[in-house]
A protein has these predicted regions:
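A metal-dependent hydrolase metal-coordination microenvironment
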Residues: 1-33
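Charged catalytic cores and adjacent phosphate/nucleic-acid-binding surfaces used
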Residues: 14-18, 31-203
């Protein structure tokens, strides 16, 4: 939890932090959020509705500062299952990410405290529609974003670039979905809007 940006440098430079593969912070104030987005050498900015007492306020510029530095925004869906107040706050911050940053670099995680709070990937992808994500953005937030944040953590620790190259037409049939995911991600990065699709359940 990060409420005061003053002492963040000591936190980031501590021995325990340097040993960590992934570094995530949870800003509980707007000042802490803006500092993390612009200055902190981290991988993830997460959100905790019960610890964050104020509505976080930031602009497209602040969001872009974070994403340009490879930082991802985590949405832990399990908070939505606990009570209506938490559900409202998670939806609110998710739609703010979409309004300000077009949901770029969003990663959906469980944040579960018990096995009962876990949901299968298909349910979580459908939940992404409620969070303001398109169908493709929801899929990306579940798989490609996780891989990207792991690669960012490697480059942050080593100072080196990591890349994987593969010819998509030579992928095995069970891996062909990766080619479509990459194409969808490239279109989103290029700024091409993807129409939202709502899956309707029939009784």
């Amino acid at each position: 939890m990060l409420s005061d940006p003053v002492n963040t440098q000591k936190l980031i430079q501590s021995g325990n932090t340097k040993k960590s593969d992934l570094i995530a912070v949870c800003p509980t104030t707007t000042a802490a959020f803006l500092h993390a987005a612009a200055n902190m050498d981290i991988d993830i900015i997460t959100y905790h509705p019960t610890e964050t007492k104020e509505l976080l306020r930031f602009t497209r510029k602040h969001y872009r500062q974070a994403t340009d530095r490879g930082i991802f925004f985590e949405i832990p869906y399990s908070h939505m299952l606990r009570d209506s107040s938490n559900r409202k706050k998670i939806i609110q911050i998710s739609h703010l990410y979409h309004t300000v940053g077009k949901s770029r670099n969003v990663i959906i995680s469980s944040g579960a405290l018990t096995p009962l709070e876990l949901r299968n990937p298909y349910d979580v992808a459908n939940l992404g529609l409620l969070l303001g994500l398109s169908e493709g953005e929801a899929r990306s937030a579940l798989n490609l974003s996780g891989r990207s944040v792991a690669l960012h953590a490697v480059t942050r620790k080593t100072g080196k670039c990591v890349s994987f190259i593969a010819e998509t037409d030579k992928l095995d049939p069970e891996e062909q979905w990766k080619a479509k995911e990459i194409t969808d991600a490239e279109e989103r990065l290029a700024g091409e809007p993807e129409p939202k699709k709502m899956k309707m359940e029939t009784a």
